[in-house]
């Protein structure tokens, strides 16, 4: 009994830490999880990240165990992951890994896939591994469904779904900045993030993303000029993704090189695109 599933990375439109309300969009970077069940009654789960063997597999192992607990089975399992989402980059690698792990395990068991259950078990696992502050429901839903999701993270409700147009490129900057998750400083900007979220609810995602990026980069001591540099080079919008250190810039195809050149002086870049496809079982 085996199953393979993939889930997307995501970029931030509104970071939910300050207010509990957030928004994210799926990007065409993925993590694939392969699960093999062992019918020995021992409930031992062993995981490995194929492309990053030093990464502790505790999150995906927890996901498998939580699925087993939910369905009250006593299998053991092997789980491996591989993907192209940089770890701890603000591109929702943990949401993608947990979604893919839960989905693959449910598939291996032959159970019906319920998106709400997948998300609940994935978020539960992330909380138990201390990998999330808010539950990251916005990131998890963008990773699972693709497209844009606007969410009440506190109540785990999707308030709105939308899509970016297909003629847009996403340029991801991954600078060598030290990650900073100062929740108290992020709470200070709550009222201003609310204003950016209002833009998001009105469908003005580009302005929302830019304003959110300025606010959170200031609160977390990341450079805000990077986003302005991207605009100067032709980007439609740009901003910090998650709590950083990555930035995302959206641009039209013809401006891709100019925007990439403006960003790559700060660090490594990856070019991708929005994805509206979402998570799926491969086999």
Curated annotation (Swiss-Prot):
It catalyses: shikimate + ATP = 3-phosphoshikimate + ADP + H(+). GO terms for molecular function: ATP binding; shikimate kinase activity. This is Shikimate kinase. ATP binds at residues 86-96. Belongs to the GHMP kinase family. Archaeal shikimate kinase subfamily. InterPro entries: GHMP_kinase_C_dom, GHMP_kinase_C_sf, GHMP_kinase_N_dom, Ribosomal_Su5_D2-typ_SF, Ribsml_uS5_D2-typ_fold_subgr, SK_arc. GO terms for biological process: amino acid biosynthetic process; aromatic amino acid family biosynthetic process; chorismate biosynthetic process. The keyword Plastid does not apply. The gene is aroK. GO terms for cellular component: cytoplasm. Gene3D superfamilies: 3.30.230.10, GHMP kinase, C-terminal domain (3.30.70.890). Its EC number is 2.7.1.71. Its main location: cytoplasm. It comes from the Archaea. Signal peptide: none annotated. It is found in: Cytoplasm. The keyword Kinase applies. Pfam families: GHMP_kinases_C, GHMP_kinases_N. SUPFAM superfamilies: GHMP Kinase, C-terminal domain, Ribosomal protein S5 domain 2-like. It is an enzyme of class 2 (transferase). Keywords: Amino-acid biosynthesis, Aromatic amino acid biosynthesis, ATP-binding, Cytoplasm, Kinase, Nucleotide-binding, Transferase.
